[in-house]
């Protein structure tokens, strides 16, 4: 796994985490993990870019997953002031994960990660690195068969009854973030989302090598095959491997939302996947899908409650940086959306397209406009400028959430983090309109623990914040 070289992380005033590296330097690292800033030679970079605030690192076009938070200036004394540096981490992760995949080197490996032109000149239908991670159904929907090794494309129980899965081809089996095979819909996030073309949004959850291999367990000891629920119970203090100070990438989860492309869509503005979509009868239909939402969760040694980043396509809903027409909003003020949504389906049961009503979605929790010198909105504009005419300039970071007071897992004897463990920032409102559509308000999200990544996932702390493992282990 390619990674940017990490350095030790230090707490700053018990509120902030930062590295001991030079915060004025680009995040490049050594060896093949390095990268460079884009140049005019790429033909992809926009013109004038806004000036960087003091101490803010220069964006880097690199296929190496960042493994540390760049050092914060001494003037940064609050989580809000630290936000730009965590947003930088999120954007660098987004670039690395969406780097073209090297399909000749197994799964989860970027192609020439130190060569920016590979990324800047890639087609918008090129398979990306995170897209070759193992999908949830490859891990938890294989009956009594043990899941295949990480690099294998073979599964004991294929998702499609009528079509083999080609190497690297996506198969969408989920109609909500909470379920895995589409008829399993008892989870909290199980109600589907319908776009303006009356098509269901499809979801996938993927695990990188470190996390997948931990859940699958070592070949030498079947008692450690943690996908078995009995073993999960016995391992009450299960910890996923974390990215360490040597730069070895630890556990990383990706959750993605996709919508079906139609004649009205400008498909050049989306990451595309020519995929198989699972139907209720078990058959699959070839469909061109476009990426509309992406959650990234990465565990670092000094952030045991993980760092949570969420991105969306700029044409999802109205708001700063948005581009009409919208995929999940009709552009009108009606129907009203006091909690961020209207026309929510009554049931998880899928119905024919003619019976569906498009879900009206608005962003209840705005993309942060603070701190004034380098807000999340500003960081988005910065990276969109660096990404120029690539497809990635059509995406935006919605929010980054992290523990401001990281707490070691070992502090809790039963392997359970308490609520609000790590003092997350922001506390509330860290939501994605495509993944937490119906949980944007604190009222709607109360039963799930709260309307943010960390508030929700602390309930799965027994499985080290992995709802997929906690719910789907069998």
Predicted regions and their residues:
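C-terminal motif of bacterial Sec signal peptides marking the signal peptidase cleavage site
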Residues: 17-20
């Amino acid at each position: 796994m390619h990674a940017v070289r990490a350095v030790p992380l230090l707490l700053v005033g018990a509120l902030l985490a930062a590295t001991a590296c030079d915060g004025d330097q680009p995040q490049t690292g050594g060896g093949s993990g390095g990268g460079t800033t884009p140049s005019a030679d790429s033909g992809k970079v926009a013109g004038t870019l806004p000036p960087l605030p003091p101490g803010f690192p220069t964006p880097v076009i690199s296929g190496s997953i960042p493994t540390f938070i760049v050092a914060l200036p001494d003037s940064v004394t609050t989580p809000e002031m630290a936000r730009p540096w965590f947003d930088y981490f999120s954007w660098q992760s987004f670039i690395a994960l969406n780097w073209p995949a090297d399909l000749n080197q197994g799964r989860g490996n970027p192609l020439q990660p130190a060569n920016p032109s590979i990324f800047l000149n890639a087609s918008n239908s090129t398979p990306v690195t995170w897209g070759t991670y193992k999908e949830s159904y490859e891990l938890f929907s294989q009956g009594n068969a043990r899941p295949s090794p990480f690099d294998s494309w073979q599964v004991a129980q294929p998702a499609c009854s009528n079509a083999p899965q080609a190497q690297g081809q996506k198969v969408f089996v989920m109609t909500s973030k909470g379920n895995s095979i589409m008829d399993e819909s008892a989870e909290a996030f199980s109600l589907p989302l319908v776009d303006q073309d009356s098509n269901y949004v499809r979801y996938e959850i993927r695990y990188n090598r470190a996390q997948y291999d931990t859940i699958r367990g070592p070949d030498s000891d079947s008692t450690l095959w943690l996908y078995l629920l009995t073993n999960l119970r016995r391992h009450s203090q299960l910890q996923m491997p974390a990215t360490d100070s040597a730069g070895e990438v630890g556990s990383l989860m990706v959750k993605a939302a996709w919508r079906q492309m139609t004649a009205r869509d400008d498909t050049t503005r989306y990451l595309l996947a020519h995929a198989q979509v699972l139907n209720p009868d078990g058959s699959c239909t070839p469909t061109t899908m476009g990426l509309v939402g992406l959650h990234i969760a990465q565990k670092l040694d000094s952030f045991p409650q993980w760092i949570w980043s969420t991105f969306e396509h700029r044409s999802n809903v109205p708001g700063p940086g948005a581009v009409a027409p919208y995929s999940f909003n009709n552009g009108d003020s009606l129907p009203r959306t006091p909690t961020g949504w209207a026309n929510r389906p009554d049931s998880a049961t899928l119905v024919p397209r003619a019976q569906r009503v498009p879900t009206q979605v608005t962003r209840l929790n705005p993309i942060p406009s603070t701190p004034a010198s380098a807000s999340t909105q500003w960081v988005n504009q910065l990276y969109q400028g660096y990404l120029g005419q690539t497809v990635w300039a059509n995406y935006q970071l919605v929010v980054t959430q992290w523990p401001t007071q990281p707490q070691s897992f070992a502090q809790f004897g039963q392997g359970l983090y308490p609520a609000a463990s790590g003092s997350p920032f922001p506390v509330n409102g860290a939501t994605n309109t495509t993944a937490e559509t119906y949980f944007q308000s604190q009222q709607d999200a109360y039963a799930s623990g709260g309307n943010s990544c960390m508030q929700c996932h602390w309930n799965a702390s027994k499985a080290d914040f992995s709802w997929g493992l906690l719910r789907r282990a069998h």
